[in-house]
Amino acid sequence: MFAEGRIPLWVVAVIAGLGVIAVVGLFFYGAYAGLGSSL
């Protein structure tokens, strides 16, 4: 996929950041929409 042997650090940081934001967003969305029923 990349010409280099390893993935650039900024690509890993962006993917990790988006993953964390997605998990936190889904958690708060589930808590808000479920009003505690998901717990």
From Swiss-Prot:
SUPFAM superfamilies: Photosystem II reaction center protein J, PsbJ. It is a single-pass membrane protein. Its main location: membrane. The keyword Membrane applies. Signal peptide: none annotated. One of its GO terms (cellular component) is photosystem II reaction center. PSII is composed of 1 copy each of membrane proteins PsbA, PsbB, PsbC, PsbD, PsbE, PsbF, PsbH, PsbI, PsbJ, PsbK, PsbL, PsbM, PsbT, PsbX, PsbY, PsbZ, Psb30/Ycf12, peripheral proteins PsbO, CyanoQ (PsbQ), PsbU, PsbV and a large number of cofactors. It forms dimeric complexes. One of the components of the core complex of photosystem II (PSII). PSII is a light-driven water:plastoquinone oxidoreductase that uses light energy to abstract electrons from H(2)O, generating O(2) and a proton gradient subsequently used for ATP formation. It consists of a core antenna complex that captures photons, and an electron transfer chain that converts photonic excitation into a charge separation. This is Photosystem II reaction center protein J.
